[in-house]
């Protein structure tokens, strides 16, 4: 059950020339092998790795819902290393994070850019983290369309609507004003982990686990 949930992530890693480690566990019933991501899922750890797109978003949402059904009162830990991607795919993850009962703690490892940064900031208050050398980038949504002038106008209005919605939610989660978010996302805005904390995108920069 767990193994199938990470087919896409595993394929991405293998395509990059790596292999997904397997973990063998001993029990009274004998040995059982898990890929490392499936084993971590048993510990309520989810990895969001790579571009945010529909297939990956569906897997993330399914895992969030599954872990809620397993235990609605225990935190879920979402680790993010993403350059961003589809707004609609990202919003499906965002809505599911807000919908389920467990708190979703978010941690940036590597990078959280664009939609990745949005999801990082959407974690439960007080439970949003970055590792010290992570990079965070926020900007306005990107879009392009070709066709008749009337259709281009329709899509331009949709992009403006999406931008306003994302900015409003970012302001809500970061504690910044809407005007500040609009100004600071006008162009690509890269931040260190400490700068992301000062801006309100995360709560803490963590160097190591508490003793």
Swiss-Prot record:
GO molecular function: ATP-dependent peptidase activity; ATPase binding; serine-type endopeptidase activity
GO cellular component term, pick one: cytoplasm
Keyword Nucleotide-binding in record: no
PROSITE patterns: CLP_PROTEASE_HIS (PS00382), CLP_PROTEASE_SER (PS00381)
Keyword Cell membrane: no
Major localization listed first in the record, in broad terms: cytoplasm
CDD domains xrefs: S14_ClpP_2
Documented EC number(s): 3.4.21.92
EC top class named in words: hydrolase
Subcellular localization, as worded in the UniProt entry: Cytoplasm
Active site: 114, 139
Catalytic activity: Hydrolysis of proteins to small peptides in the presence of ATP and magnesium. alpha-casein is the usual test substrate. In the absence of ATP, only oligopeptides shorter than five residues are hydrolyzed (such as succinyl-Leu-Tyr-|-NHMec, and Leu-Tyr-Leu-|-Tyr-Trp, in which cleavage of the -Tyr-|-Leu- and -Tyr-|-Trp bonds also occurs)
Homology family: Belongs to the peptidase S14 family.
Name this polypeptide is given: ATP-dependent Clp protease proteolytic subunit
Species this protein is from: Pseudomonas fluorescens (strain Pf0-1)
